[in-house]
Amino acid sequence: RNLWKPAKPWTGDRPVTREELAQHTSFDDCWVVIRGKVYDFTEWKDHHPGGPFVARIYGGKDATAEFGEYHSRLAERHMEHFCVGPLVGASAERAGDAV
């Protein structure tokens, strides 16, 4: 199985509210915001080179700054199938900066 494609890929077009994001903060159900987009990190966390603990730290939060420090734009493109959709109310600057 391809690590860059979850068992049930997301289409990346479903808007996510902050209230919904707040429901996905656990180790077994972890969504993270990067550049105004919400990603379901749940299935990928065990393969993350930095370790699965990242899910505990950033679940339900915006990890844009931290992501940018350690990842290339290529890494962001690899995550496209994990993208749930845009975060409702995310700043246009952050959302527009996405790949």
State where each predicted segment sits.
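Histidine-anchored, small-residue-rich loop motif
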Residues: 1-99
